[in-house]
Amino acid sequence: MDFNVTIVGQAISFVLFVFFCMKYVWPSVIFIIETRQKEIKDSLTFIENSKKELNIFKENSKNEIKIIKKNASKIIDSAIQQKTQILKQAYLAAEKEKQTILKQAKLDVMIEYQKARYELRQKVSKIAVEIAKKIINRSICIEEQNSIISSLIKKI
C-alpha cells in the first residue's frame, strides 16, 4: 500500500473535521444530552414523589373512610336506640291511654248498670203497686187473682 498525499490530505481533513466537531458541534450536543438527562431525571424524581404522595393520600383516604364508617355506624346505632326509646315511650303512653279508656268504659258501664237497675226497681215497684191496686180494687176469686199475677209476672 502506498502512502500518498491523498491519504495524508484525507487524514488531515479528518483531523480538522474532528477538531471542528469537538470545538463547535460536540459541546452543543453534550449540552443537549445533559439537558435531556436532567429533564428525564427530574421527571423520574417527580414521578417517584407523586407515587409517594399518592400512596400517602390513599392511606389517608382509607383512614378517613374507616373513621367515617365508624361515625356512620355510631349514628345508625344512636338512631336505632332513639327509635327503640320512642317506640317504648309510645307503647307506654298507648298502654296508659288504654287503661284510662278501660277505666272510663267500666265506670260508664257501671253507671248504666246502676241506672238500669234503678229504673227496673222503679218499674217493678210500679207494677207491684198496680197489682196490689188491682187485687184490692177487685174482689174476685182466687183463680182470677192467680191468673192476673202470673200474667203480670210474665210481663216483667
Swiss-Prot record:
GO terms for molecular function: proton-transporting ATP synthase activity, rotational mechanism; proton-transporting ATPase activity, rotational mechanism. Keywords: ATP synthesis, Cell membrane, CF(0), Hydrogen ion transport, Ion transport, Membrane, Transmembrane, Transmembrane helix, Transport. SUPFAM superfamilies: F1F0 ATP synthase subunit B, membrane domain. CDD domains: ATP-synt_Fo_b. It holds the Pfam family ATP-synt_B. F(1)F(0) ATP synthase produces ATP from ADP in the presence of a proton or sodium gradient. F-type ATPases consist of two structural domains, F(1) containing the extramembraneous catalytic core and F(0) containing the membrane proton channel, linked together by a central stalk and a peripheral stalk. During catalysis, ATP synthesis in the catalytic domain of F(1) is coupled via a rotary mechanism of the central stalk subunits to proton translocation. Component of the F(0) channel, it forms part of the peripheral stalk, linking F(1) to F(0). It comes from Buchnera aphidicola subsp. Baizongia pistaciae (strain Bp). The chain crosses the membrane at residues 12-32. F-type ATPases have 2 components, F(1) - the catalytic core - and F(0) - the membrane proton channel. F(1) has five subunits: alpha(3), beta(3), gamma(1), delta(1), epsilon(1). F(0) has three main subunits: a(1), b(2) and c(10-14). The alpha and beta chains form an alternating ring which encloses part of the gamma chain. F(1) is attached to F(0) by a central stalk formed by the gamma and epsilon chains, while a peripheral stalk is formed by the delta and b chains. Its main location: membrane. This is ATP synthase subunit b. Belongs to the ATPase B chain family. InterPro entries: ATP_synth_B-like_membr_sf, ATP_synth_b/b'su_bac/chlpt, ATP_synth_F0_bsu_bac, ATP_synthase_B_chain. Gene3D superfamilies: 6.10.250.1580. It is found in: Cell membrane. GO terms for cellular component: plasma membrane; proton-transporting ATP synthase complex. The gene is atpF. It is a single-pass membrane protein. It comes from the Bacteria.
